Amino acid sequence: LHKDIEKSELRFALGIPGSMTLRTLGITDTEHANSRWNEHLLKYKSRIRLFDGIPQLLGNLKMNGYQLGIVTSKTRNEYTTDFAVPFALSDYFCTVICVEDTLRPKPFPEPLLSYLNASHINAENAIYIGDTIYDSQCAQKAGVDFGFAAWGNAATQGVQADYLFKRPADIPFSLIKS
């Protein structure tokens, strides 16, 4: 692109596949650009941290019988190298749906519907917790309640949520109450 892009102009990219972001930015060789992106990510990988309370939250939910899964816009390779391996959280999740597992990514409902099908869960017995408008739209289109994880995201415009979680510790309390 050879141009500076303001951080605020890139908010749209949070929660959609990298290839979709690159095409939106006018980049045609998305394979090369994605490769470069992943190379740069490796340089800063050690700075990436989980939000406080996430391991405790996942342990608490699993211990209380909740079936946990992930629906992500990351590729399976990105999920493995950026999340599963560095944070050692894979044991908490029964099913992981990555971008290449369905034909249409979030905000379409297919990834979440695929998760529900693979996990043998009805939409009315599920809650999808996410932090982007694309997560909200995906849940709404799939007929699943949506919990907005607002602790790390200032971009709430347009997000429709059944639950608002201001910090990870709010999640179990909210689920038990309902």
Language-model regions: role of each:
Residues 1-59, 64:
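N-terminal helical cap/lid subdomain that shapes the substrate entry/recognition surface
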Residues 8, 59-62, 75-76, 81-178:
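Asp-based, Mg2+/Mn2+-dependent phosphohydrolase catalytic module
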Residues 13, 71-73, 129:
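Structural motif
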Residues 44-48, 73, 105:
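Transmembrane alpha-helical core positions of polytopic small-molecule transporters
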